[in-house]
Design a protein with these regions (language model features):
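Glycine/serine-rich phosphate-binding loop and adjoining beta1-alpha1 elements at the start
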Residues: 1-41
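Conserved phosphate-coordination/catalytic loops
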Residues: 10, 107-110, 140
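Glycine-rich phosphate/diphosphate-binding loop of Rossmann-like nucleotide-binding domains
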Residues: 30-119
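Short acidic active-site motifs
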Residues: 115, 141-144
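An anion/phosphate-binding loop that grips the pyrophosphate of nucleotide cofactors and donors
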Residues: 123
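Glycine/threonine-rich flexible loop motifs
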Residues: 131-140
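Conserved small/polar residues in nucleotide/adenosyl-binding loops
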Residues: 147-149
Length: 149
């Protein structure tokens, strides 16, 4: 495993562990005589190495996990880990020949913002791992959308 992948793997794992440490409710669903406690809902934005590790870790700990990515190949990977993949309506595959994400069009970004804004209304924890190689990490969730959490 190369250095970047190994560090991304650890970052995805640690992001979940730290997020759960700050979360003030139970993570897995619990059914007791007193009632049912619903599972925490986690959204992972970006399903590369770090994102997939975050999906796997959150799922293993009992959360309901949603994930999104601009690369269509990541849909199968997310679902194989037990996550639910969120697809932007009319989305285009934004994957380079090397398998990395590339910059999205303004129209795509608007549709993505609408999808995430609606999704955030039912999410407890958000983990952002989206990255475009050689560029600053994209701002995918606006401050206005964060109000819904």
């Amino acid at each position: 495993m190369d250095i970047l992948s190994s560090q991304a793997n650890l970052a995805g794992y640690k992001a979940v562990i730290e997020a759960f440490a700050f979360f003030e409710k139970a993570i897995p669903m619990m059914m007791t005589a007193a009632g049912t406690v619903p599972a925490a809902k986690v959204l992972v934005v970006g399903a590369g190495v770090a994102g997939l590790q975050a999906v796997a870790t959150a799922k293993r700990m009992g959360a309901v996990v949603f994930a999104t990515d601009v690369r269509m190949a990541s849909k199968e990977q997310v679902e194989s880990l037990g996550g639910k993949f969120l697809t932007v309506e009319g989305s285009e595959n934004l994957e380079t020949e090397g398998g990395y994400a590339k910059e999205a069009s303004e129209d795509f970004k608007k549709k993505q913002e609408e999808l995430l804004s609606e999704t955030l209304k039912k999410i407890d924890i958000v983990i952002c791992t989206a990255l475009i190689p050689g560029k600053k990490a994209p701002v995918i969730i606006s401050e206005l959308s964060l109000i819904h959490i």
